[in-house]
């Protein structure tokens, strides 16, 4: 994938940790961040659908990003952090390991996803930024929540 195929992103990204790697989503999509929430499992749902959460009376689908990105399951007894994103007027939650910071990124620093990304992850990453010696992977939130 080149930057010609995926438009560069810039501005503010809400960053989070997942399996030791730093990811980010555009702040414009983030509604709120919550501590671990009780999940109601959904029978016969795709593996990436961790369940449903009750967000002040609104039922919201919870997507397990570890599953979507082909990462190992969250260690037993470890709670996820919930990032609620709003897309096309609908709320969806993303389960991550830990929330990091909101960072400003320059579209000129946008790079194509690393060649080392494979499988499911390659399709969900828009690109990368080098941030203080750390690689920040920009998640395509629309693809991440799509079946």
Regions found by a protein language model. Name each.
Residues 1-147:
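An acidic, low-aromatic, low-complexity terminal/linker signal
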């Amino acid at each position: 994938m080149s930057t010609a195929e995926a438009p560069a992103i810039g501005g503010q990204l809400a960053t989070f940790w997942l399996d030791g790697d730093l990811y980010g989503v555009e702040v414009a999509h983030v509604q709120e961040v919550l501590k671990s929430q009780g999940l109601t499992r959904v029978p016969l749902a795709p593996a990436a659908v961790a369940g449903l959460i009750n967000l002040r009376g609104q039922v919201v689908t919870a997507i397990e990003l570890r599953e979507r990105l082909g990462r190992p399951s969250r260690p037993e007894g470890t709670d996820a952090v919930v990032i609620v994103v709003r897309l096309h007027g609908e709320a969806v939650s993303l389960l991550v390991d830990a929330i990091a910071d909101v960072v400003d990124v320059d579209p000129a620093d946008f790079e194509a996803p690393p060649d080392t990304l494979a499988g499911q992850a390659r399709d969900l990453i828009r690109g990368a930024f080098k941030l203080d010696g750390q690689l920040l992977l920009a998640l395509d939130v629309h693809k991440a929540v799509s079946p």
